[in-house]
Amino acid sequence: MLKTISPLISPELLKVLAEMGHGDEIIFSDAHFPAHSMGPQVIRADGLKVSDLLRAIIPLFELDSYAPPLVMMAAVEGDSLDPTVEARYRDALSLQTPCPEIVRIDRYAFYERAQKAFAIVITGECAKYGNILLKKGVTP
């Protein structure tokens, strides 16, 4: 047992976070995301909300300061976003100061980034457009 590490962070996720280098990306996805067909390592976090995992990992994870470190999927034409999803994520990420802006990219651009990600953490999140990409930075 390690002190000050949230019990929400599985040993597998902790290992992946430690193995990632600066510039590597990790996806925290909703339960509907096609993670297993994307290619990178998939970590299961069934039953957990993305916002809870973000809150747990952000004290351990330095976000990139040279490129946008937070990326979410934009709504498909004719669809709409639920603003409370981004608000929950921003609240969870607020432990990182200053908290960078969240950039939105189109669905297929997000899928391309996911295929190149270091890992995808598939959660129990059911919110529409509930996926977020984090780019790891260099510790100061």
From Swiss-Prot:
Cystine pairings recorded for this chain: none
Domain of life, per lineage: Bacteria
Pathway linked to the protein: Carbohydrate metabolism; L-fucose metabolism
Binding site for substrate: D30, R107, Y129, G130, N131
GO biological process: fucosylation; L-fucose metabolic process
Subunit relationships: Homodecamer.
Protein family per UniProt: Belongs to the RbsD / FucU family. FucU mutarotase subfamily.
Name the UniProt record assigns to this protein: L-fucose mutarotase
Organism, scientific name: Citrobacter koseri (strain ATCC BAA-895 / CDC 4225-83 / SGSC4696)
Gene name, Swiss-Prot/TrEMBL: fucU
